[in-house]
Amino acid sequence: MGNNVVVLGTQWGDEGKGKIVDLLTEDAKYVVRYQGGHNAGHTLVIDGEKTVLHLIPSGILRDNVKCVIGNGVVLSPEALLKEMKPLEERGIPVRERLFISEACPLILPYHVAMDQAREIARGKKAIGTTGRGIGPAYEDKVARRGLRVGDLFDMEAFAEKLKEVMEYHNFQLVNFYKAEPVSYEAVLEEAKGYAELLTSMVIDVTDELDAARKRGDKIMFEGAQGTLLDIDHGTYPYVTSSNTTAGGVAAGSGFGPRHIGYILGIAKAYCTRVGAGPFPTELYDGLEKQDPVGKHLGTVGHEFGATTGRLRRTGWFDAVAMRRAIQINSVSGFCLTKLDVLDGLEELKICTGYKMEDGSVLEVSPMAAEAFEKATPIYETMPGWSENTFGAKSLDALPQAALNYIKRIEELTGVPVDIISTGPDRNETIIKVHPFEA
């Protein structure tokens, strides 16, 4: 059972999943993406060299790891090919090790146009999407009008389907959003090129993963974004368009849920959020909220989105929201990242409850964004530490105050912290329990 591990974010994304996936894939044969698209940014630092991946699983930097993009991922062929190029220029074999489900919905130029037109139309009520066509592509999938990777291999049928769906989208773009239409001929010509370039990588992902499981190969499933951005369980409508939770693994890859052995939840030692939406423990947003501790977290933590480059909002660790993430994902253990960012703070706060307008106190976060926005955090204060934890590789190297902070998080959430990250490099990590050995 321990052969198959899920790594996912338990906050609002940007928790540091890429580094941990890269670290743990030393023991894996497969790394699988099961949801999202190129709106996710995973940053890896290996021997000081920085790599940012958006679509390709983080295991691509490990020579013997096969990387899989499951059917739950919305695939932009343009973005994928752009991402492959610099990796191949560095001598990393991508085509031989990257496999794509034929059932992946395609992101095409009209999805991007629709995404951006909608955000402009929303004005101050904008959700804060990346503008990369993710939501509209998922919409087409659910409406059963979407084009999929497998459609590229019958170009005559593809052209007919494309014409129909583009008439639908262009009508909305022109008549409702007062935007420019997207050229059918240009999109079709692009698609012909994609078919030729992607063919060799397309496989039956479900069959491949089942065969790997039967051989005893270790499989890692790499989540994108975070639990609180899940389309069903997040702070709706300020969410992404896919299931970012553990339940998304089976649906987004075709891998049977009974075969998942360990679920690793990734959480920062504090909280961040990009874009709009409620954030009860928020300290700093660069605009209205200018708390110096929040600014410290953003500056020292280099809190800028890997995909958007946008400044992340920062705040204290939220055990209330974490309890909800644990319920949804049945988290086996945590990896606490960016512990070193807290170095030098005299005191730390952990949110232990939400006080609501009616005077009630919630110990588990509510579902709706409206309720989130009315929550006042109840804090527990703990002493900080002045010692340097950056790059620590053992518990003995951590000050007692840091150990106390970690222990308190375990007590408040009821889940053990099995891994602690103390820097961006893969070796700046303390592993108490290895997920593949749990």
From Swiss-Prot:
GO process terms (BP): 'de novo' AMP biosynthetic process; IMP metabolic process
Cofactor binding annotation: Binds 1 Mg(2+) ion per subunit.
Alphabetical list of InterPro entries matching this protein: Adenylosuccin_syn_GTP-bd (IPR018220), Adenylosuccin_syn_Lys_AS (IPR033128), Adenylosuccinate_synth_dom1 (IPR042109), Adenylosuccinate_synth_dom2 (IPR042110), Adenylosuccinate_synth_dom3 (IPR042111), Adenylosuccinate_synthetase (IPR001114), P-loop_NTPase (IPR027417)
EC top class, as a word: ligase
Family matches, as SMART domains: Adenylsucc_synt
Cofactor(s) named in the record: Mg(2+)
Binding site for substrate: A306, T307, T308, G309, R310, L311, R312
Pathway: Purine metabolism; AMP biosynthesis via de novo pathway; AMP from IMP: step 1/2
Molecular function via GO: adenylosuccinate synthase activity; GTP binding; magnesium ion binding
Binding site residues for Mg(2+): D14, G41
Family recorded in the similarity comment: Belongs to the adenylosuccinate synthetase family.
Protein function: Plays an important role in the de novo pathway of purine nucleotide biosynthesis. Catalyzes the first committed step in the biosynthesis of AMP from IMP.
Protein name according to UniProt: Adenylosuccinate synthetase
Protein source organism: Vibrio parahaemolyticus serotype O3:K6 (strain RIMD 2210633)
